[in-house]
Amino acid sequence: MSTSTQNIPWYRHLNRAQWRAFSAAWLGYLLDGFDFVLIALVLTEVQSEFGLTTVQAASLISAAFISRWFGGLLLGAMGDRYGRRLAMVSSIILFSVGTLACGFAPGYTTMFIARLVIGMGMAGEYGSSATYVIESWPKHLRNKASGFLISGFSVGAVVAAQVYSLVVPVWGWRALFFIGILPIIFALWLRKNIPEAEDWKEKHAGKAPVRTMVDILYRGEHRIINILMTFVAAAALWFCFAGNLQNAAIVAGLGLLCAVIFISFMVQSSGKRWPTGVMLMLVVLFAFLYSWPIQALLPTYLKTELAYDPHTVANVLFFSGFGAAVGCCVGGFLGDWLGTRKAYVCSLLASQILIIPVFAIGGTNVWVLGLLLFFQQMLGQGIAGILPKLIGGYFDTDQRAAGLGFTYNVGALGGALAPILGALIAQRLDLGTALASLSFSLTFVVILLIGLDMPSRVQRWLRPEALRTHDAIDDKPFSGAVPLGSGKGAFVKTKS
């Protein structure tokens, strides 16, 4: 940013086309959030109608996470090859169809499959929308682009909670899913009315199509074994989360098998930069493990342990969702001011002060509970708005959509594990204590992984010849790229 423009308000650095691109992607992400959280709102109703156990009911939330890794890979590769816009539109259509299918589901298995479809669409929407907006905005505003965009998901959750309080008591839980068909109309409008991302257009102008992650894995030398491993991973995840396995050793073994498969895919597609990709998956895994027990099971906690009626539940969830949305925007400003990683760590540390009081206060004062949730979610969940910017900075434009989509959505399996883990712990403790304990302890793991820039640090330890020293999105240096105590002079920009 030149010195002549430093005193101009940030929003004046954006032209009409950039604002239109953001608005379209933000609305798409709002609809994504609306569709995705519906199952959490009606989980108790679905559990009662289908006669499910608590763990089975929680697995319906998990189902959408199980398929996300493949959706992120497939639709991310589409975004790298054919453009961010087409991938974004396709993703919206996919999760809308899955939501409609939930409304018609006759039982557990059908709804589980519909949730798998939603997960694929959600994964594609996350990767394509994030890269679309980030690559359309100026470099010095890209934390804001990321944070503002992800706020749409939280706003969608708030809207869903309000619609839930109006629709479900009158028409039942299935009517809520029928509303999910509306995003398809929006997707058709998007296809004709938004431009392609600037970075992608510049990178691909007059050039041959890039070799995507799908090309490497499913059209390359090892395509047969990779296809087999894909089916094995899908089957293993199915048995882990929907197969009612009671043996913890078998579940752990299947989880380890999936980890080996995903690491294999990362090594094949990323070459010498695989340590960075693997560490990014770990960052996202623990980010979901600390945040999603609350996201997924908060409605159940409010309805069962605090005995709130649907209207009160909707009001409390408004505070929670609105806090997360505000936090995404605040995180964008903090990220552009302090730097992405420093802003992330500071916000998470502040959120730790509030997590215990949220679940210790009980249900006697709804307004105090709502305010505590607002600030805790603003600091703890909202900062995840800049996670796409953080991850995307480790990938070049040619592989950013698939790289972001795959690493994020493999790590998002933590979101599949989180509600089940919370439900299992709640069998020994009350649900509120289980949620507070999980969130408080696992947040510190994320603080260490991001604060120490472990993706760059592990890359430097294992494959230093492929080390990237600067963020590919905003050109700022990675702190983990040089040994501690080396000083700023050690940062020499490299291309990789």
Swiss-Prot record:
Transmembrane feature ranges: 22-42, 58-78, 86-106, 116-136, 148-168, 170-190, 224-244, 247-267, 278-298, 313-333, 353-373, 374-394, 406-426, 431-451
GO molecular function terms noted in the UniProt entry: carboxylic acid transmembrane transporter activity; sialic acid:proton symporter activity
UniProt keyword list: Cell inner membrane, Cell membrane, Membrane, Sugar transport, Transmembrane, Transmembrane helix, Transport
Pfam families linked: MFS_1 (PF07690)
PROSITE patterns tied to this protein: MFS (PS50850)
Subcellular location: Cell inner membrane
InterPro entries assigned to the protein according to its UniProt record, in alphabetical order: MFS, MFS_dom, MFS_trans_sf, SA_transporter
Topology with respect to the bilayer: Multi-pass membrane protein
GO cellular component, as recorded: plasma membrane
UniProt KW Membrane keyword: yes
Substrates-to-products reaction catalysed: N-acetylneuraminate(in) + H(+)(in) = N-acetylneuraminate(out) + H(+)(out)
Disulphide connectivity of cysteines: none
Record function comment: Catalyzes the proton-dependent transport of sialic acid.
Cross-referenced HAMAP family: MFS_NanT (MF_01238)
Annotated family: Belongs to the major facilitator superfamily. Sialate:H(+) symporter (SHS) (TC 2.A.1.12) family.
Record's protein name: Sialic acid transporter NanT
Source organism of this protein record: Salmonella heidelberg (strain SL476)
